[in-house]
């Protein structure tokens, strides 16, 4: 497997570096910046699992650490403010750097702080979950939730580099592993059916090298897409398959009942059912999706009686993908994807949605 993928960005190019030696790779990335101040942003789970690694950071660099509570509720302006306070207290300048080491929440949060502190300081991502390695760290999207709404405030702000080490996945709980598989299945189902089929048949326990190949293949797909459409005006919209409903579920469940990959799995099933109902997708493809989600213990139906189709529809109206009058869904087709525009006043769609959940 190649050690580096180079990502072209209209904002700033960056490298995705594959390694088993995080400390050495980070040192190589920093270069002359080794003498600058570094703020490592992480969460309590990662900090306790890899405390020795953070101790080595402290020995080698002028390093500070900010440790967040785990979970989606840390993606908040309150947490951003706390990190700003630490940066100001330690007199961080535009030439100093943030390094995120954690899952998607930590990466999105730290990237947003980097994008906005002094109108932008450099940062490096070290994603530690499967989902963050194959999806959220790539493409420059950073942001936080606001008033319960998912990723409501954010920007496109690429990192200096992304360091991928599959050794972090050895401590990843099965639930989090399945959430990462969910995003890999998403990109495979829309853009790379051979990848989808390989994931369907993959045996995690006996094929570590196979996992590395699948991760590389998933990342390569996302790299290709974001290079063609960095600001989500066309092709990159396809990566929102499952996300209109998934983000609404996360918002209504306060970002703590379902993990991101689980909410997106439910969203993908509903999008696929819509596609089947419009004869855009063969029912056999929907059945295949349901089977592979079941294999990875991903939910396929909404299990919260307090979350109704009506409440979901109200949250849809705040989605970033919307046009002025329409809610946008991404539907899979036999050969790719298409968009479905639902009028914001179409209450008949609420009944349709209720039948699909």
Curated annotation (Swiss-Prot):
Record-given protein name: 3-dehydroquinate synthase
GO annotations of cellular component type: cytoplasm
Q: Which PANTHER family match?
A: 3-DEHYDROQUINATE SYNTHASE
Q: How is the cofactor bound?
A: Binds 1 divalent metal cation per subunit. Can use either Co(2+) or Zn(2+).
An example GO BP is:
chorismate biosynthetic process
Pfam families on file: DHQ_synthase, DHQS_C
What stretch or stretches form a coiled coil here? none
Write out the GO MF terms: 3-dehydroquinate synthase activity; metal ion binding; nucleotide binding
Indicate yes or no for the key word Methyltransferase.
Answer: no
